[in-house]
């Protein structure tokens, strides 16, 4: 009635059902309960169990304890206990109609690590790149025909106190709990298999993830999720060591719907970039460094939507140094760029600020940082189309306000169709392009119009444009101009003077020259007091800069003190040469009155002296020379005035020639005409 077998070995082969097994170290006890029921107890070493040419068990110690029922066309095991190594389950097995079977199994409080250890070898690739631990309970059914390759599988499970990590990445989830189902689908294979996750809850070190998901096609995992998250960005610093974002801090929360392939190896990034992703997010009190930026970027708050590779920023408040910026718009292909899937990303939208401090964007504690890092190469990884609206911009002494217009960046080039701004007490409109050439130099080409700029403020702000010939303290007035400019800098942002070209139309209104030494050199003709402060209403000219020379075509200055025509050039090495024509009707009258006190009282009001004195003013920043080119005098004097001509000649001789001893008398050509 009872049977006991010790230390036996059993080898079984059935080519029809394609079942093969080899059992060693068998200790078997069979107790008969009735004619068709037995109690089977056994423990053994299963060397192998193969089914349909697949290795299900290899070298595992197995303990079995349960009832066996043997009936015609039906064999069953009801609520038996089986333990494979440290994995314990209850199961029931029913064979019927000779070829069909149903296997029900159930486990409670089992270690997931034991399931992994006892997973058939042909399935272990599932776990190659992941680490899973924790508790699981399950109940399932395997149903099929013995002679068919794959039976159907359906499992209900729940997980608690579990963890999940990646072998090649520090990404880690802990305290995982969820429940769901596992099924191999209609075709009973990996391709139609699915795993559902319901009420999924997990924690990171400083965050949480909750939601649900489904994994389908275990040959090539497809993941669909609907999750809510609240995460610390500190943890992301370790996920991608090659990311241009580093030293991240702050929090991000939102929801995410993911649909696409997923893998836990090197193909993870590719799958991520090609998935359908939709996420609404909020960022608060976040900071990070980005590439070679000089300072940390602070995001006070931001709200947006991620739609696959497009990030729509609904609103954001960003702080960089002392500058607070508001941005809304789209960022496309940022994630593919971060993960080296695409060479660049594109930003478009609206940027506004109450005040921008330019120095914060180009300097840090290292004085050479700007030259050594930021200027050697303009970035080629970003493209931008931005509408700007900046209330104030500060850079050194430069104060700009009400900046608006479009700013574009592509292929290492900034460009704009139109930007408006206010500066130096006036308004400016500009268009142009600033770019990095193939020679690694930097070039600008701009068409600029400005109206009513304050001359003193302009010269003061730009530190007299690096020259000392004429300075802010010498100038007052309003200047308007339209000019075209081409300029180049080397890769440390030093101007290349020989490549500077400028063509302009300018007009100065309400102009004043104050204590301008070169003009005071004309004191032989005009009172020194008059020359110290010259006022004129309007001055117009076309200025050209080319070949390191500023060319000044003839322009007329009219004032109460002096009227003159000036033309010439001023080189970048501070050498200059100007032609000056003086209209001496008033000049000589002033001198004449000093010598002849009765002239003013006796002269007729219609009498005029018209004399043209042509001078050359040349020199450099260290010296100034003035010489005569030609002196012409015209007269139209009524009868009796010729006598006064001799007095005028005497004045010139005494007051001009004697003071300019280096001038040769023969160079003064006096041309007199009897008629006007």
Give, region by region, the residue ranges found by the protein language model.
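Membrane-proximal interfacial segments on either side of biological membranes
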Residues: 2-51, 70, 75, 87-200, ...
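Short acidic-hydrophobic surface loop/beta-edge motif
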Residues: 5, 82, 202, 318, ...
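Contiguous, well-ordered beta-strand patches that form the walls/edges
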Residues: 44-48, 55-68
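Hydrophobic/aromatic beta-strand elements that line small-molecule binding cavities or substrate pockets
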Residues: 66, 543, 567-568
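Conserved Rossmann-like nucleotide-binding pocket used by diverse enzymes
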Residues: 314
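Generic long, charged, amphipathic alpha-helical segments
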Residues: 536-543, 548
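Short, glycine-rich nucleotide/cofactor-binding loops
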Residues: 556-558
């Amino acid at each position: 009635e009872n049977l006991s077998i010790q230390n036996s070995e059993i080898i079984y082969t059935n080519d029809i059902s394609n079942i093969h097994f080899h059992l060693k170290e068998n200790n078997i006890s069979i107790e008969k309960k009735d004619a068709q029921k037995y109690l089977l107890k056994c423990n053994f070493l299963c060397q192998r169990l193969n089914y349909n040419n697949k290795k299900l068990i290899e070298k595992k110690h197995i303990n079995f304890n349960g009832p066996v029922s043997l009936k015609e066309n039906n064999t069953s095991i009801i609520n038996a206990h089986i333990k494979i190594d440290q994995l314990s389950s209850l199961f029931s097995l029913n064979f019927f109609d000779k070829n069909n079977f149903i296997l029900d199994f159930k486990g409670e409080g089992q270690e997931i690590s034991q399931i992994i250890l006892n997973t058939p070898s042909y399935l272990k690739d599932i776990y190659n790149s992941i680490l899973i631990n924790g508790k699981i309970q399950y109940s399932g059914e395997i149903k099929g025909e013995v002679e068919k390759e794959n039976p159907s599988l359906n499992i209900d499970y729940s997980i608690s106190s579990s963890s999940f990590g990646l072998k090649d990445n520090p990404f880690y989830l802990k305290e995982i709990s969820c429940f769901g189902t596992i099924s191999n689908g209609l075709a009973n294979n990996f391709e139609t298999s699915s795993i559902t996750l319901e009420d999924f809850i997990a924690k990171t070190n400083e965050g949480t993830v909750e939601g649900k998901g489904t994994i389908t096609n275990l040959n090539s995992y497809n993941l669909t999720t609907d999750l809510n998250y609240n995460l610390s960005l500190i943890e992301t610093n370790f996920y991608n060591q090659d990311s241009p974002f580093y030293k991240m801090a702050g929090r991000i929360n939102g929801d995410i719907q993911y649909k696409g392939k997923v893998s836990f190896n090197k193909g993870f990034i590719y799958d991520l970039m090609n998935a359908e992703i939709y996420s609404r997010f909020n960022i608060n009190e976040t900071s990070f460094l980005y590439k070679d930026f000089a300072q940390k970027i602070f995001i006070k708050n931001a709200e947006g939507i991620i739609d696959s590779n497009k990030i729509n920023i609904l609103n954001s408040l960003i702080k960089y140094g002392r500058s607070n910026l508001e941005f809304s718009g789209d960022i496309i292909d940022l994630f593919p760029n971060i993960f080296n899937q695409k060479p660049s990303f594109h930003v478009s939208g609206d940027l506004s600020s109450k005040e921008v401090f330019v120095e914060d964007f180009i300097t840090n504690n290292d004085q050479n940082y700007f030259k050594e890092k930021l200027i050697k190469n303009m970035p080629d990884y970003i493209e931008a189309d931005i509408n700007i609206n900046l209330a104030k911009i500060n850079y050194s002494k430069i104060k700009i306000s009400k900046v608006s217009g479009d700013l574009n960046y592509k292929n290492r080039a900034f460009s704009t169709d139109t930007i408006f701004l206010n500066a130096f007490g006036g308004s400016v409109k500009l268009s142009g392009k600033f770019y990095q050439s193939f020679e690694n130099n930097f070039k600008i080409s701009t068409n600029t119009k400005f109206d009513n700029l304050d001359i003193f403020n302009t010269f003061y702000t730009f530190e007299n444009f690096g020259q000392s010939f004429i300075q802010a303290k010498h100038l007052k007035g309003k200047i308007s101009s339209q000019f075209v400019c081409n300029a180049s800098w080397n890769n440390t942002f030093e101007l290349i003077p020989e490549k500077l070209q400028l063509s302009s139309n300018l007009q100065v209104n309400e102009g004043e020259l104050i204590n301008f030494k070169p003009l005071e050199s004309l004191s032989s003709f005009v009172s020194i007091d008059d020359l110290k402060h010259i006022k004129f209403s309007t001055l117009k000219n076309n200025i050209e800069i080319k070949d390191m020379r500023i060319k000044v075509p003839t322009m007329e200055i009219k004032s109460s003190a002096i009227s003159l025509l000036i033309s010439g050039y001023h080189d970048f090495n501070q050498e200059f040469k100007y032609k000056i024509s003086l209209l001496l009707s008033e000049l000589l009258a002033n001198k004449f009155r000093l010598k002849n006190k009765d002239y003013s009282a006796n002269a007729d009001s219609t009498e005029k002296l018209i004399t043209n004195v042509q001078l050359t003013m040349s020199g450099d920043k260290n010296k100034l020379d003035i010489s005569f080119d030609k002196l012409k005098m015209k007269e139209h004097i009524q009868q009796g005035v010729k006598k006064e001509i001799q007095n005028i000649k005497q004045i010139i001789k005494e007051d001009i020639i004697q003071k300019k001893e280096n001038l040769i008398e023969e160079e003064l050509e006096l041309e007199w005409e009897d008629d006007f």
